[in-house]
Amino acid sequence: MRAVVQRVSSSKVTVDENTIGQINKGLLVLLGVTHDDKSSDVDYMIDKILNLRIFEDENDKMNLSLMDIGGELLVVSQFTLYGDCRKGRRPGFSNAARPELANNLYEEFVKKAKDKGVTVGTGQFAAHMMVELTNDGPVTILLDSSKSF
């Protein structure tokens, strides 16, 4: 499982000109799933993302987590995080999970974040979405549950 985590002052996702998910201060998470991901990958990513200390404390040091500041989460499915561009000029997506598995794990991720008391907005799985964000920093972190990077 891969995630691009961006610290934002606000973010929203629209489908067909309708806003379907919106947050204020918090994290925008673009979430990708691969073939062998399972619930343990979701647990790893939830723990890591909710507890990443990437918000400033009173001394302007990145020392506070989303949980510490009571921030919000906007989660958007993103199969293109598994795009392979090593050959040719068009990415291949064979490393992305099949939609059934990806959607199940995406929904599990959202549920587990909500179960932790986080306000969560979402995109729409497999839809063409417009994502707007106001980066704060900017701070952008790449995560991979297999710890590839």
Curated annotation (Swiss-Prot):
This protein's UniProt keywords: Cytoplasm, Hydrolase, RNA-binding, tRNA-binding
Record-level GO cellular component terms: cytoplasm
Pfam short name (any one): Tyr_Deacylase
Main localization of the protein described in the UniProt heading: cytoplasm
CDD domains: Dtyr_deacylase (cd00563)
Extent of motif Gly-cisPro motif, important for rejection of L-amino acids: 137-138
Domain of life (superkingdom): Bacteria
GO BP, sorted A to Z: D-amino acid catabolic process
Enzyme Commission number, as recorded: 3.1.1.96
Catalytic activity, reaction form: glycyl-tRNA(Ala) + H2O = tRNA(Ala) + glycine + H(+); a D-aminoacyl-tRNA + H2O = a tRNA + a D-alpha-amino acid + H(+)
Subcellular location: Cytoplasm
Xref: InterPro entries: Daa-tRNA_deacyls_DTD (IPR003732), DTD-like_sf (IPR023509)
GO molecular function term, any single one: tRNA binding
Keyword Metal-binding part of the UniProt annotation: no
Domain notes: A Gly-cisPro motif from one monomer fits into the active site of the other monomer to allow specific chiral rejection of L-amino acids.
Similarity section: Belongs to the DTD family.
Role according to the record: An aminoacyl-tRNA editing enzyme that deacylates mischarged D-aminoacyl-tRNAs. Also deacylates mischarged glycyl-tRNA(Ala), protecting cells against glycine mischarging by AlaRS. Acts via tRNA-based rather than protein-based catalysis; rejects L-amino acids rather than detecting D-amino acids in the active site. By recycling D-aminoacyl-tRNA to D-amino acids and free tRNA molecules, this enzyme counteracts the toxicity associated with the formation of D-aminoacyl-tRNA entities in vivo and helps enforce protein L-homochirality.
Record text on subunit structure and interactions: Homodimer.
Name of the protein this chain belongs to: D-aminoacyl-tRNA deacylase
Gene: dtd
